[in-house]
Amino acid sequence: MKKIFAIAALSLPLFSHFPAFAGASDELKVKLTEISSLKANFNQTVTDINDKVIQTGEGVFALSHPNQFYWHLTAPDESLIVADGTDVWIYNPFAEEVSVMDLNQAINASPIALLVHSDDETWSQYNVSQKENCFDISPKDKDSGGSEVQVCFNDNQLTKMVLKDQQGNISDFTLTNQSVIAGKDQDLFKFVVPDDVDIDDQRLKSTN
C-alpha cells in the first residue's frame, strides 16, 4: 500500500469530457507562476476502480518555482519526495531506499512536476482543459503510460489535486493551511541522503 502514495504523489495530470483549448493551458501556467511558492498540509483519500476507499493519509506539500517541490507523507506510513531543481529524490524510510531521477524523467512519468515547470516544449506534450476553477491535464500520447491529474483553485489559491493512475485508482488531495515559503522552509527542497540506505540512481545524465 505504501507504493500507492509514492506513485500518487509522483504522478501527481483528471480526466474530463470537456475539450482542451490552448487558452486553458496558458491560464493554468499563469496561475501556477503566480504561486511563486507554497507550503500546505494535505489529506489524501485513495479509491479503487469500484469507488471503494482503500487508503487515507496526510502530510505536507510544498513547491517553489522553478522546478522545486516537496511531498512528505507522514501518516499512515512515512515517505518523502523532493525535487531540488535538478533531480527528484524518492525516499522510503521503511525500505531504507532512495531512488533518484532527472527532473525531466519525473515529468515524463508524472505530470505533477508541471506544477513547477514552465518550459513550453514540455507543456506542449499535454492537453489541458478547464471547467470553472479546475484544470484537467492529460498526456497527448495515450500510449505514454502517463497519469491524468486535475488541479483546482479558489481564486489564485491551489486547494485540490486529483490523480487517476493506470490501474483506475483515484487519489484525492485536499490542501489546507497554505502559506508562502519563507526562511528555513527553503531547506525543504534540499535532500540529504541518510546514512546506510540503498541508492537506486536512475538518472540518465552523468553524475558528479
UniProtKB/Swiss-Prot annotation:
A single GO cellular-component term on record: outer membrane-bounded periplasmic space
Signal peptide (residue range): 1-22
Record-linked SUPFAM superfamilies: Prokaryotic lipoproteins and lipoprotein localization factors
UniProt keyword terms in alphabetical order: Chaperone, Periplasm, Protein transport, Signal, Transport
One Pfam family cited in the UniProt record for this chain: LolA
Subunit annotation: Monomer.
Protein's name according to its UniProt entry: Outer-membrane lipoprotein carrier protein
Species annotation: Shewanella halifaxensis (strain HAW-EB4)
Organism lineage: Bacteria, Pseudomonadati, Pseudomonadota, Gammaproteobacteria, Alteromonadales
